[in-house]
Structure formats: structure tokens, C-alpha cells
């Protein structure tokens, strides 16, 4: 098994409820190590750029508005099969379909306010990490 990196966002619904520590603890309990982390308030331009792949989707405007509605915590996570492990601990996008004990089942308010984002592939993880972090900000 290879050690890899993935990208995670703790979304505004979770930071608003002071869940950053609880969510990070679940990630660490799953064997992921936080190698970079910062709390930011995304600009509209950042959110539109980050979620640009969804630009033509009907939910794009609402997604951008939500992601700029409050602070987020962007993180680089490292571990064995980090992308798959992070997605497993996050749970299904819709918290109603998420397994018990997952972040979304435990903390999400709705399919839109689902507390976390995680990269869906190693390739996208690199793109997403590079969007928010300089190499010197990642300390393994």
C-alpha cells in the first residue's frame, strides 16, 4: 500500500458549529495525518475557481454562496490510500445515505451542508492541494 496525500475541506456549516476539532479527530482516528491546515474565508473568486468543474450545473451558484458564507478549514491529509480512506470516513454525500459513524452521518445538516469535502482521486487531490497550498506549507 502506498502512502499518498489527499485534500479536505471542513465546510462553513461545520466551522460555524465549532466541529473542526471533532472532524479532524475522526480523520486522525482513521489513520490520516494532517500535514497542512489553514482556516480561511474563501472569496467568491476562489470558490468559483475551485468548483469550476460544476460551473454549468444548476447548483453552482448555491454551492459558491454556501462555501463563502463562513470560514472553512482546508487541509492536506497523508496516509495509506489517503483518498479512499478519507472518502470512507466522510461517508456518502447525502448524509441520509451515509454509514453510521461517518463524518457526514454524525455532523452533516443536509446534502448541501454536509460538513466536509474530500478529493475523489489522487489526480484531483494534487490539483486541489495546489489550489490552496504552496509546497513549503506542507510539512510531512
Swiss-Prot record:
It is an enzyme of class 2 (transferase). It catalyses: a 2'-deoxyribonucleoside 5'-diphosphate + ATP = a 2'-deoxyribonucleoside 5'-triphosphate + ADP; a ribonucleoside 5'-diphosphate + ATP = a ribonucleoside 5'-triphosphate + ADP. NCBIfam families: PRK00668.1 (NF001908). This is Nucleoside diphosphate kinase. Its cofactor is Mg(2+). ATP binds at residues 11, 59, 87, 93, 104, 114. Keywords: ATP-binding, Cytoplasm, Kinase, Magnesium, Metal-binding, Nucleotide metabolism, Nucleotide-binding, Phosphoprotein, Transferase. Major role in the synthesis of nucleoside triphosphates other than ATP. The ATP gamma phosphate is transferred to the NDP beta phosphate via a ping-pong mechanism, using a phosphorylated active-site intermediate. It comes from Rhizorhabdus wittichii (strain DSM 6014 / CCUG 31198 / JCM 15750 / NBRC 105917 / EY 4224 / RW1). It is found in: Cytoplasm. The gene is ndk. The keyword Cytoplasm applies. The keyword Membrane does not apply. GO terms for molecular function: ATP binding; metal ion binding; nucleoside diphosphate kinase activity.
Amino acid at each position: 500500500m502506498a502512502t499518498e496525500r489527499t485534500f479536505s475541506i471542513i465546510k462553513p456549516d461545520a466551522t460555524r458549529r465549532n466541529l473542526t476539532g471533532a472532524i479532524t479527530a475522526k480523520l486522525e482516528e482513521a489513520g490520516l495525518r494532517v500535514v497542512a491546515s489553514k482556516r480561511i474565508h474563501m472569496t467568491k473568486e476562489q470558490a468559483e475557481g475551485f468548483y469550476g468543474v460544476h460551473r454549468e450545473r444548476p447548483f453552482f451558484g448555491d454551492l459558491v454562496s454556501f462555501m463563502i458564507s463562513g470560514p472553512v478549514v482546508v487541509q492536506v491529509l497523508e496516509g495509506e490510500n489517503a483518498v479512499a480512506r478519507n472518502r470512507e470516513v466522510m461517508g456518502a454525500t447525502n448524509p441520509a445515505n451515509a454509514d453510521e459513524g461517518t463524518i457526514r452521518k454524525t455532523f452533516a445538516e443536509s446534502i448541501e451542508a454536509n460538513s466536509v469535502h474530500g478529493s475523489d482521486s489522487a489526480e484531483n487531490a494534487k490539483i486541489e492541494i495546489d489550489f490552496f497550498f504552496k509546497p513549503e506549507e506542507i510539512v510531512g
